[in-house]
Amino acid sequence: MPQHRTTDVVVIGGGQAGLAAGYHLRRAGLDFVILDADTAPGGAWQHTWDSLHLFSPAAYSSLPGRLMPPQPGETYPDAAHVVAYLTDYEQRYDLPVHRPVRVSGVHRDGERLRVETTSGTWRARAVISATGTWSRPFIPAIPGRTGFQGTQLHTVEYARPSDFAGRKVIVVGGGNSAAQIAADLAYESDLTWVTLREPRYLADDIDGRALFDHATARRKALDEGRTDTSGVASLGDIVAVPPVRTARDTGLLKPQPMFTRLTATGVEWPDGTTADADTIIWCTGFRPALSHLAPLGLRGPRGRIPTAGTRALAEPRLHLLGYGDWTGPASATLIGVGRPARDAARAIAELLR
């Protein structure tokens, strides 16, 4: 028989944002559960490519209440270290995570919100959606894409360069993921890196610490009614982590302009130039994973739900956490999600009094 349960708050998503929410809900004295679709702790970090490293030291990659310990021999921790940290965090605070549980929909149900899942129904006084973006990869509608006879992957499906040894690979995208995957492939594959505009590297001495400090300063300026035009964000898009820096400086990363269409065997540029490809890897970003909130009818422009901070404007019982700057500055990062998680927990505690 399906189960029907009641709680103060349902948190949807057991990655870094969901755990940060759980930490602050516990401190606020609220009854809550965290519903996670994955079978194990670690969120999206357990699904990344093998060589992925953070671009901040461990101390600048921590959730509230517990510093991430350094990884021996590494300035910037790898994804496996992050998974171990999140697993420990969840256990240390005895967070009530239920998994694997997939949420199919959130509905208004009188004074509560009804959360329908694969393991039954929860009725909650408030909901925090923290499902992130990793489960909703975006690939642009490029002419000819369905007719390409090679292999097409998104960032989420890339694992290691040895899978593409000796093959002609085109990497599409101008952000950190594209640069890191291109650098990963540059030594074993016949690589072409394609970007919409010329890649902009941040200075080599800038890492995630500076980016977080800038995001914090930007939020303070906005809160005070000022326009923040300073900081590192205007200087580049790509953090020059050591593998990217090495590949760039040795001439292995030579970006090409964006092509206009795919052919059966590769790609074609506006001047008629073509290039063959065995594989195209789309490092073209993600969209918020919000389909479970569709029954509430809240979606606005660009697929987002209009918010004030983390609170949905049209449904004060719903908070959105960790989807990007529109749900809090740097809220999609380990260190940045703590403050909006705290704000969401406080707002919910006030609402439920």
Model-found features: residue ranges?
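A short acidic, helix-capping loop that chelates divalent metal ions and anchors anionic groups
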Residues: 69-73
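Flavin (primarily FAD) cofactor-binding/catalytic cores of flavoenzymes
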Residues: 2-38, 42-44, 77-353
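Redox-cofactor-proximal catalytic regions of oxidoreductases
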Residues: 40-67
